[in-house]
Amino acid sequence: MAARLCCQLDPARDVLCLRPVSAESCGRSVSGSLGDLSSPSPSAVPADHGAHLSLRGLPVCAFSSAGPCALRFTSARRMETTVNAHQILPKVLHKRTLGLSAMSTTDLEAYFKACLFKDWEELGEEIRLKIFVLGGCRHKLVCAPAPCNFFTSA
């Protein structure tokens, strides 16, 4: 079963809120500056899974040495898969299925930063609302509390 999350920029607080699409769940916000992040709970992000990295709102598998679980980014407005434009993560996931070495932790961090923030900075509010689908991923994001009413299905 896929985990569906709403990613919403709150301009009043300058934070990026990641929330479950379906219900009111517990969670967190990620700072828009990528600098002042509140520390995650120890059970949510183990130290050996990249907890020291700046994007702690991502699932713990995102920075594991084995690479992330299947992950795709979609724009809520266009419902397009944007990850394929970069042609980076699909190759990494394919290599992973073949047992080959995956992308380095530094490369993964840069990749996610580019996907999450570059378009928002350059294009403004056009694609600020995105849905993250973790297909069959057992790893959980630490999300901001409150339901997300912008998108009811993906």
Curated annotation (Swiss-Prot):
Record PTM: A fraction may be phosphorylated in insect cells and HepG2 cells, a human hepatoblastoma cell line. Phosphorylated in vitro by host protein kinase C or mitogen-activated protein kinase. N-acetylated in insect cells.
InterPro entries (alphabetical): Transactivation_prot_X
Mitochondrial targeting sequence, as annotated region: 68-117
Domain of life of the organism encoding this protein: Viruses
Location(s), subcellular: Host cytoplasm; Host nucleus; Host mitochondrion
GO cellular component, one term: host cell mitochondrion
Family the entry assigns: Belongs to the orthohepadnavirus protein X family.
Listed name of the protein: Protein X
